[in-house]
């Protein structure tokens, strides 16, 4: 029985970044794959480029129509995806060779898992490495203290995390009220019901620099993460929320130090 992996990518006017993403999926040697691309109505030539890629690669399916933000676009992709597992890959991110084979092998060995996640390299726009992230979260308690590893690159990286069809059927898609940290709220809901398997392999590369969503929305991402923690773990001053908030503050202060050092190097 074949195990199909769907990749969902949402994009809007990102013609300069998107080819690397598309080619990284096409280059995967794992044959049972599909790439679902949701374009939000681009006007920069992306639509014509998608036509050309779809003609070249039969595993690509795509639509182009207006949407109300990234979460809604991703949910359209999840609804179209037909795989046994789904990965969400940003239009400015890309997979490393052998990623889909490794993910499929992990699910073959552990079919009960709801999520499979691996490492992710975070790079600047010029491709130089900033930090290597490891996937280590396996329980909901880990997510409560997701910032506790301040100063250490340890988390559940979104580009290198895959979700089973069974898990998506249980919890549904992304909350469309979230614009920047929709994946974190999704992790909380998923880990209420399913286990996470982590693999000791770098699966994806996450671009973080000027022009990327993460670069321009860091503070808003953190604000949404705090809101998700409050919604799921109760009002401030409850023990789980305090554990989350203290670890978050430590991480935030560490990020400020890193940003200051980066400015001094310029």
Regions found by a protein language model. Name each.
Residues 98-131:
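Conserved donor NDP-sugar-binding/catalytic core segment of glycosyltransferases
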Residues 1-27:
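N-proximal low-complexity "stem/linker" segments adjacent to membrane-targeting elements
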Residues 16-19, 44-52, 94, 98:
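Acidic helix N-cap motif at the loop->helix transition within catalytic regions
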């Amino acid at each position: 029985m074949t195990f199909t992996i769907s990749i969902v990518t949402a994009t809007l006017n990102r013609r300069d970044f998107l080819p690397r993403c598309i080619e990284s999926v096409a280059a995967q040697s794992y044959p049972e794959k599909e790439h679902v691309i949701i374009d939000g109505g681009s006007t920069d030539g992306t639509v014509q480029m998608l036509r050309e890629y779809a003609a070249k690669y039969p595993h690509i399916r795509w639509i182009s129509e207006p949407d109300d933000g990234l979460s809604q676009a991703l949910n359209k992709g999840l609804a179209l995806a037909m795989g046994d597992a789904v990965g969400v890959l940003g239009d400015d991110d890309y997979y490393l060779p052998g990623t889909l084979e490794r993910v499929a092998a992990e699910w073959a060995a552990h079919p009960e898992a709801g999520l499979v996640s691996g490492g992710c390299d975070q790079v600047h726009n010029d491709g130089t490495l900033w930090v290597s992230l490891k996937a280590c979260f396996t329980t909901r308690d880990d997510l409560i203290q997701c910032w506790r590893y301040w100063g250490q690159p340890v988390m559940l990286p979104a580009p290198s995390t895959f979700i089973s069809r069974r898990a998506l059927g249980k919890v549904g898609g992304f909350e469309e009220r979230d614009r920047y940290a929709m994946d974190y709220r999704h992790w909380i809901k998923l880990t209420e019901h399913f286990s996470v398997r982590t693999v000791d392999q770098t699966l994806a590369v996450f671009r973080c620099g000027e022009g990327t969503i993460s670069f321009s929305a860091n503070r808003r991402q953190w604000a949404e993460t705090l809101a998700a923690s409050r919604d799921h773990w109760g009002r401030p001053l409850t023990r789980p929320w305090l554990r989350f908030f203290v670890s978050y503050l430590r991480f935030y202060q560490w990020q400020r130090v890193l940003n200051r050092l980066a400015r001094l190097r310029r």
